[in-house]
Amino acid sequence: MQGMIHLYCGDGKGKTTAAVGLSVRAAGAGKRVLFAQFLKDGSSSELNVLRALQNVEVACREQNFGFFKAMDGQTKAAAQKAYSALLEDVMRKSADGVDLLVLDEAVAACNHGLIEEATLIDFLRRRPETLEVVLTGRDPSQHLLDAADYVTEMRKRKHPFDRGIAARRGVEF
């Protein structure tokens, strides 16, 4: 089966949730899943379930670098090093029998210069023929849009955050 590239983007809620759902579906079908998270510290609730699934490996960096806008130069350099290494690691692992690779928030990591978009695009072009890939994040470049076979845009129409309600564990993270 030819692998496809999925891009879940937009300013609405549900990008990671959709990627998790596809991961569960693939694992349930006996497929091997590698779920990598960028810009998150590994504490999101969905990872507890994914880590418990037999065919799923979770890859993330457990350091919390904070929000990109608040990073000083030293913190940004450390985040860039950590996330570039994460991308290299999952690219290498994906050649070893992985059926589905999720790169959660890879789009945002590219947008902030924490991973090289050219490296990601090159990987997407050279990936194993049967590897299905999911990318998530806001504001993908035209290069990423062009590389994708599926583009699904989640659009925010209304969100509790706009009323000052903070993210809730088990719902938003």
What do the predicted segments below correspond to?
Residues 4-92:
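Conserved P-loop
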Residues 22, 48-51, 73, 115-119, ...:
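Short, glycine/charged-enriched secondary-structure capping and boundary segments
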Residues 25, 49, 123, 143-144:
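Hydrophobic/aromatic ligand-binding patch that stacks against planar heteroaromatic rings
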Residues 33, 133, 151:
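Hydrophobic anchor at the start of a short beta-strand
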Residues 39-42, 64-65, 107-108, 139-142, ...:
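Conserved nucleotide-binding/hydrolysis micro-motifs of P-loop NTPases
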Residues 70-132:
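Phosphate-binding/switch loop-helix module in NTP-utilizing enzymes
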Residues 136:
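Conserved D-loop beta-strand region of ABC ATPase nucleotide-binding domains
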Residues 139-173:
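Phosphate-binding/switch region of NTP-binding enzymes
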